[in-house]
Amino acid sequence: MEMVTLGRDGPPVSRIGLGLAATGRPAYITTHRDADFGSDRTEDALRQRTWQLLDAAYAAGVRYVDVARSYGSAELFLSQWFAARGDADDLVVGSKWGYTYVGGWDVAAPVQEVKDLSPSTFERQYRETNALIGDRLRLYQVHSLTVESGALENTALLAALAAHRSNGLLLGITTTGPAQADTVRRAFEVHIDGVQLFSSVQATWNLLEPSAGPALEEAHSGGWAVLVKEAVANGRLTRYGDAGAPGTPFGNAAAAAGVEPDALALAAVLAQPWVTVVLSGAASVDQLTSNLRAGETPVGVLPSLAEPAAQYWATRSARPWT
């Protein structure tokens, strides 16, 4: 597995990381979820699934894992896995604050998470994350930051973040929506006491939604780590999705390359020279194994799949939690 540095001064990480959004809670917005999980979505079942993924990922050389306070029990599962293994000290953990999980382990809950980017939420969730992850936490990110949230003008919040940065914690942002580029550029400008506050960004970039690419390239050129999420567009670029199914232009391109569409979608991300890490959101070891083939998959000429950003995000927003 190819290794890189997480930004200017961060730890070494693998170029493919594992995200636990899909397995830390019973409901999410990914394609094919009912078939992937079936009806057994108890906390014990998802813990075992998460541990299997972590074991397989670590054995394959993955050295970055992505969690969040809002991913149900993802941080808890990860901390228990660390304790059970007693090793894996070189696995770098990035987490996020800003959303609180309120789904109550109920797939049908009308609200699964609540967003609040206030200083009090940051302090509370940092304590919660730190209690579980401790010194293994290397990167803490504002979850789904937008310019409209006002967080970048909240001086109390910025001061609280800066206090933790001065203790050696890397700070980053994640962003979402059609205005990702604006958020990245605005966050890049934030300095506290003459020092840039953030050092990384996690954003959506995929063959259906590449609009943030220029801003992400600028951030990378400026020394930031760039982590890419939703490389398979929540399943749309897999064999089960509308854009990756057999017989579609992208499905045909994957077949010609001798890989599954998910592997080719991740390979397309890795081919961008400004990408530090691309996240696998695999829900099973088989999916992870397929995703990891991206690291050895050459990317030739691919069909043009890009949608208008507003259209892409409207489609994503309409997806049900299942």
Q: Model regions: which residues?
A:
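Active-site groove signature of glycoside hydrolases
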Residues: 128-150
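N-terminal binding-site loop/beta-alpha segment at the start of enzyme catalytic domains
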Residues: 1-92
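Short, well-ordered coil/turn segments that N-cap beta-strands
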Residues: 11-16, 61-64, 87-91, 134-138, ...
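A short, structured active-site edge motif that brings together acidic residues
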Residues: 89-103
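Beta/alpha (TIM)-barrel catalytic core signal, keyed to glycine-rich beta->alpha loops juxtaposed to Asp/Glu
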Residues: 144-322
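Conserved, mostly hydrophobic/aromatic
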Residues: 6, 18, 65, 78, ...
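Short, acidic/polar
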Residues: 42-57, 115-132, 179-191, 261-265
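Active-site mouth loops of central-metabolism enzymes
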Residues: 24-48, 107-121, 148-149, 253-256
